[in-house]
Amino acid sequence: MLQLIRACIHDKKSLLQFGPTAPKYAEVINVQTADIETQLTMPIRRSASGLIMPEDWCPVVESLSNNQKISYCIKHWRDGLSWEKSGAIDFHMKAIQVNGRIDHCRTRADVDQRLSRLDKIWQLAERTQKLKQKREVSPFSFREYGGILVHIDGQGNPIFGLGGQHRLAIALTVGLRSFPAQL
């Protein structure tokens, strides 16, 4: 319900300010996988989805290769290492120790279940050569809210917004040409 309220407010403001081609809140866009090379160093909240930034907006970015979650996923899915040897278990357990939870996980059993679910999603993506949009996964999803978060810089290049890291890792390791993303 909150997403719907945010969308109505955002979409109406954008329509009035920028016209009918303005981006919508949590709008789904199709991104070419090969075009994603950088990520933000600090996340921007998903609630800022669809905002048009000033022309001189210059976020601090770094190489996607610096992303720990994507790195351990590549080690697991592409290089064949176990989740344990890829560093995924240690990464999650340290985050749980510091923050109490990560990715809805609070225990080692939760982490194991999550990684098992990710393996199933990866297998489906490999078999079908696509990632499902959020609405295909859950009928209660609003647009692409919760998907791979992507921002577009002033030159039209996509920047990974640090949301949907495992899904992006799936797109990269399966070799998908493109994937759905939340703008």
PLM features: residue spans?
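Extended, charge-rich helix/loop segments that form flexible
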Residues: G50-V111
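Long, acidic/serine-threonine-rich intrinsically disordered regions with weak helical/coil propensity
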Residues: K24-V31, D35-I36, A48, V60
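Surface-exposed polar/charged interaction patches
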Residues: A7-D11, N67, T128
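Short alpha-helix boundary/capping and kink motifs at helix termini
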Residues: I89-F160
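A structural boundary/capping signal
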Residues: L40, W57, S65, Y145-G146
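Phosphate/pyrophosphate-binding active-site loops
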Residues: K130, A169-L183
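A sequence-level detector for short glycine-anchored, His/Arg-bearing signature motifs
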Residues: I152-V174
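Membrane-proximal basic amphipathic "stem/tether" segments
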Residues: M1-V31
